[in-house]
Amino acid sequence: MAITAQLVKQLRERTGAGMMDCKKALTETNGDIDAAVDYLREKGIAKAAKKADRIAAEGTTYVASSGNTAVLLELNSETDFVARNEGFQALVKEMADHILATKPADLDALMASEIETGKTVETKLNEAISTIGEKLTLRRFVLAEKTDADAFGEYLHMGGRIGVLAVVENSTDAEAAKDVAMHIAALNPKFVSREQVSAEELEHEKEILKQQALNEGKPENIVEKMVEGRLRKYLEEICAVDQPFVKNPDQTVAEFLKSKGGSLKSFVRYEVGEGIEKRQDNFADEVMGQMGK
């Protein structure tokens, strides 16, 4: 497979590794970018990629609750200017209220649902597009339920750039739940606890850590212990309950919630535009792209 300049660029963006290292990794893995990420990590050249898609789309996240139901949603616009527009913000709130009231099963059901007499959500959005003059996309939403004995943690960071909805069990301390949601916004864990990490992911990480240790020239007899220690540290980094609590690093999130009589049941974290990349090719990139073909 031809290793194009665009492929090298993508790998550099995902790993932060140098151009020649990326080119070699892609050559060794026959252009498989995921395998190339692993190759670079095994060589100690790149850190674990945390969903390294560039954040590019504009818009906002929004979180709201009513009784024992809460919603987190993302509404995208083309520019940040529109995202701060009062009409846009009112639309976001209206969508959240509608979702809480109707509890649609998915995005398709939401778009087809009636938000006003004779008017669907899709029609409402199209009208807003005509008024505002930009393409708007209701990209995603999630609903969460709790009992009277639980609490929602609702947090918006940077005016909605990041939104978090957490459910804390066996505690009605909404302030503590909000603090945990703020922690999740800041540290971006992947899982609630290590029980949620699949055996496949653990084995994958173990293999990478083993290769790292071997490539560092460590003796075989101590590699296993090194892998165990590094895997434990990796799990502490990706599991919310094991992370040092952002407001008091002397205790973990689990310990903080335990002091309030609760535990973290679930969370969802949205960051505006994650996974969406605007095309931003400049002339130099275009020329490199042509040369690489």
From Swiss-Prot:
Annotated region (Involved in Mg(2+) ion dislocation from EF-Tu), positions in chain: 79-82
Alphabetized GO MF terms: translation elongation factor activity
Top-level lineage group: Bacteria
One Gene Ontology term, aspect cellular component: cytoplasm
Transmembrane segments: none
Keyword annotations: Cytoplasm, Elongation factor, Protein biosynthesis
Matching CDD domains: UBA_EF-Ts
InterPro entries linked to this entry: EF-Ts_dimer_sf, Transl_elong_EFTs/EF1B, Transl_elong_EFTs/EF1B_dimer, Transl_elong_Ts_CS, UBA-like_sf
Alphabetized Pfam families for the sequence: EF_TS
PROSITE patterns tied to this protein: EF_TS_1, EF_TS_2
Subcellular location: Cytoplasm
Keyword Magnesium part of the UniProt annotation: no
Keyword Protein biosynthesis applies: yes
PANTHER family for this protein: ELONGATION FACTOR TS, ELONGATION FACTOR TS, MITOCHONDRIAL
Family: Belongs to the EF-Ts family.
HAMAP family assigned: EF_Ts
Known function: Associates with the EF-Tu.GDP complex and induces the exchange of GDP to GTP. It remains bound to the aminoacyl-tRNA.EF-Tu.GTP complex up to the GTP hydrolysis stage on the ribosome.
Name the UniProt record assigns to this protein: Elongation factor Ts
